[in-house]
Structures are given as C-alpha cells and as structure tokens.
C-alpha cells in the first residue's frame, strides 16, 4: 500500500488557513487538493511550471490598478525628491532584488516552501501578521542564509 502525506498536508493547510483567516492559503490548498484528487491532476505540471509567473502578473495588476481607477495618482516629479519617496524607491529596488534571490531558491529547493508556508500561517494565526506568502519569506531566507 502506497500512502502519500500530501493530501493530509493540504488538508492541514486548509484548516490552518481557515483558523488564521488566510484566504490565499485556504483557497490555494483547496484547489490543489481538488486537482490532486480528480482528473485535474494532469494540469498540476502546468500550474507548477507557470503558476508563480501568473501569480506575479496578477499581483502586479492588483498593485497598478489604483492608478487606472484614479484612486492613486502618479506624483509630480518634484515629489520624488523628498526623503520618503527616495526611500520608497530604494526599498522597492532592494525588495525586487531580494525577489530575484527568493524565486530561484523556491525552484531549487521546493521543500523549503513547506517551511515557509507553515511559518506564514503561524505568523498570521498567532502573531497578527499579514499573509504575504512564501515569496517574500523565500526572499528573506535567501538573503539571510546566503542563497541557501
């Protein structure tokens, strides 16, 4: 008899996602569990190959949409010359660089994603954190641990 812990792990993530009010983990784990347990399993390699890039595209659309809706304005050039705006630009550059370290780490050592997910869920459930997900956690892990 061949037993896989993956469905149990996904159910655990679903429960932790519900308890911690982390919809992204709840929905993601539910979709993956349904895919794994049905004929949709044939599409898992496609999700594995393109899911992260599609997710980043959707995230970028979500971040830029306030500009399109008019809820946010592009500031005049003069406003880029204050300390907060300059700091925001440099922090954005730094975080983008970190992401360049974290995404490859997730591809090279996908087992670490499990730990990052568990840590994210615990941080949200018990420490009042925000579910930014494993991507920024992988970025920081890569930075702290020297590209693991």
UniProtKB/Swiss-Prot annotation:
It is a multi-pass membrane protein. Keywords: Cell membrane, Membrane, Transmembrane, Transmembrane helix. This is UPF0756 membrane protein NGO_1674. Belongs to the UPF0756 family. It is found in: Cell membrane. The keyword Chloroplast does not apply. GO terms for cellular component: plasma membrane. The keyword DNA damage does not apply. It comes from the Bacteria. Pfam families: DUF441. InterPro entries: UPF0756_TM (IPR007382). The chain crosses the membrane at residues 10-32, 50-70, 85-105, 116-136.
């Amino acid at each position: 008899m061949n037993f896989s812990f993956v469905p149990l792990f996904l159910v655990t993530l679903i429960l932790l996602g519900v308890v911690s009010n982390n919809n992204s983990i709840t929905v993601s784990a539910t979709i993956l569990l349904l895919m794994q347990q049905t004929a949709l399993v044939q599409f898992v390699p496609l999700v594995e190959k393109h899911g992260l890039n599609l997710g980043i595209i959707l995230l970028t659309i979500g971040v830029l949409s306030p500009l399109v809706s008019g809820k946010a304005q592009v500031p005049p050039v003069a406003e880029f010359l204050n300390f907060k705006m300059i700091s925001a630009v440099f922090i954005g550059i730094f975080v983008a660089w970190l992401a360049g370290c974290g995404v490859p780490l997730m591809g090279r050592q996908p087992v670490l994603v499990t730990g990052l997910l568990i840590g994210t869920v615990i941080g949200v459930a018990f420490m009042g954190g925000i579910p930014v997900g494993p991507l920024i956690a992988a970025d920081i892990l890569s930075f702290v641990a020297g590209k693991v």
